[in-house]
Amino acid sequence: MDLEAVCKRSALHAKPQGLILQYGTAGFRTNAQHLDHIMFRMGLLAVLRSKQTRSTIGVMVTASHNPEEDNGVKLVDPLGEMLAPSWEEHATCLASAEEQDVRQVLAAIVEKEAVDLTQTAFVVIARDTRPSSEKLSQSVIDGVTVLGGQFHDYGLLTTPQLHYMVYCRNSGGRYGQATVEGYCQKLSKAFVDLTNQVSCSGDVKRSVKVDCANGIGALKLREMEHYFSRGLSVLLFNDGTQGRLNHLCGADFVKSQQKPPQGIEMKSGERCCSFDGDADRIVYYYCDADGHFHLIDGDKIATLISSFLKELLLEIGESVNLGVVQTAYANGSSTRYLEEVMKVPVYCTKTGVKHLHHKAQEFDIGVYFEANGHGTALFSEAVEVKIKRLAQELDDGKGKAARTLASIIDLFNQAAGDAISDMLVIEAILALKGLTVQQWDAIYVDLPNRQLKVKVADRRVISTTDAERQAVTPPGLQEAINDLVKKYTLARAFVRPSGTEDIVRVYAEANSQESADRLAYEVSLLVFQLAGGIGERPQPTF
């Protein structure tokens, strides 16, 4: 490793003095002006990770649902999953190192991880459509090449497409072809095979309106739609030709504001969905005959998918370990419906998609979605092989169910949550079951809920357990929350510290909106009093 050359090149990507950023679930994210040095250094780190794992590593330049002026970067591990936690720490150390310490930090990573520097390295790079992304991805390439790594620049991709490419490259082609065409063809063939089962006798062609958040999703959906256009018409809105990325549109806006995005015309009963800026999240919604807006979030998406998978498994007659993974933010009604009606086991993990993904890997079939619409389904290799064998061997109704399940398996992007893949899965299931969007929404009724934030002097005062549903410290807080919850019907509440700033997040749900609002307010007052609240005391919102 020519550290002299690295240091010389690093000086051309100088770090702003005193800037400290932490590698989190979403990698690094901040204003694009501050990211040049981080991009270069993540190129360096990707080479070391590639040498250590003897695999292709991915680097994605994106800031997902953040505003257009921001950008970010995250590394993708060999199976398309997020970077290993120990390497997240290396990323933080390397990004935060002052210029004179870069050499030392790199040497320490090499020693600690026993990196064989003679090993070849291969890195694949992609970016979203932000104005800053092309220049920043060149800084990544600069870091890769100065350490002698080889690379392939995919140019513009959605984040889940890059995860898919990494997985394909490291599976020796078993998972699919590591090209955009390979991705489009695999998903489209599975979708067309599924929708061909649906009788079209006089039916109007199915269509869905898609808000693409003025991001990369529009570009990639347009590239792909001709592959499956016979089965589904997609009408694109916020396609990047006019508005700003994520501005008053996109999945995050729709979920947080509980209203439709700008730039989309909604008629009663029409299915609409929104992607986020890098197309790894999706939420659905519609307006009823009275003009009321209805959101269908990740909880209801997981319920639709897992219920359908359970039905297919029952038809095939296979006993398979199927589980759904949620976070504490999942609506209580969804958990009750899955456990009590569908008899599907539900597991709760800490917030953060990497926790859900890892838990889902423990099942034969693991379905996970965060309420924000980020999720997918994972199938063990043994289950995939078995289902595809049954699909070929069986002729009767069992064979048809096995073939349907085999196509569903191919339609999922198992490397990461993928808005395009998830949309096609949802559209296929709705078509096969003959469900309208209103009927899907009516599977269960969400419990009213409220989320609040409380400013505190130090968020570390609060620690949690039981997948963030119980507060351990400060003493007395959890007991006081329990006493408040007992006053309301079908109620629960929890508090958790933010991962990035000194605030505590409060969640409450109950059988009425007024009760949920009151409970959230009372819990936020407790946090303010017992956990060192600062600034203005929480005020009632009801």
Swiss-Prot record:
Role: Catalyzes the conversion of GlcNAc-6-P into GlcNAc-1-P during the synthesis of uridine diphosphate/UDP-GlcNAc, a sugar nucleotide critical to multiple glycosylation pathways including protein N- and O-glycosylation.
Positions bearing Phosphoserine: 64
UniProt entry keywords in alphabetical sequence: Acetylation, Carbohydrate metabolism, Isomerase, Magnesium, Metal-binding, Phosphoprotein
GO molecular function annotations of the record: magnesium ion binding; phosphoacetylglucosamine mutase activity
Cofactor(s) the protein requires to work: Mg(2+)
Active site: 64 (phosphoserine intermediate)
Gene3D superfamilies in the cross-refs: Alpha-D-Glucose-1,6-Bisphosphate, subunit A, domain 3, Alpha-D-phosphohexomutase, C-terminal domain
One GO process term, biological-process aspect: hemopoiesis
Modification N-acetylmethionine occurs at: 1
Catalytic function, reaction form: N-acetyl-alpha-D-glucosamine 1-phosphate = N-acetyl-D-glucosamine 6-phosphate
PROSITE patterns: PGM_PMM (PS00710)
Cofactor binding annotation: Binds 1 Mg(2+) ion per subunit.
Residue sites binding Mg(2+) per the record: 64, 276, 278, 280
Name of this chain's protein: Phosphoacetylglucosamine mutase
Superkingdom: Eukaryota
Coiled coil ranges: none
Record-listed Phosphothreonine modification sites: 62
Organism the protein comes from: Mus musculus (Mouse)
Enzyme class: isomerase
Pathway field: Nucleotide-sugar biosynthesis; UDP-N-acetyl-alpha-D-glucosamine biosynthesis; N-acetyl-alpha-D-glucosamine 1-phosphate from alpha-D-glucosamine 6-phosphate (route I): step 2/2
UniProt family annotation: Belongs to the phosphohexose mutase family.
Residues at which substrate binds: 370-372, 496-500, 505
EC number: 5.4.2.3
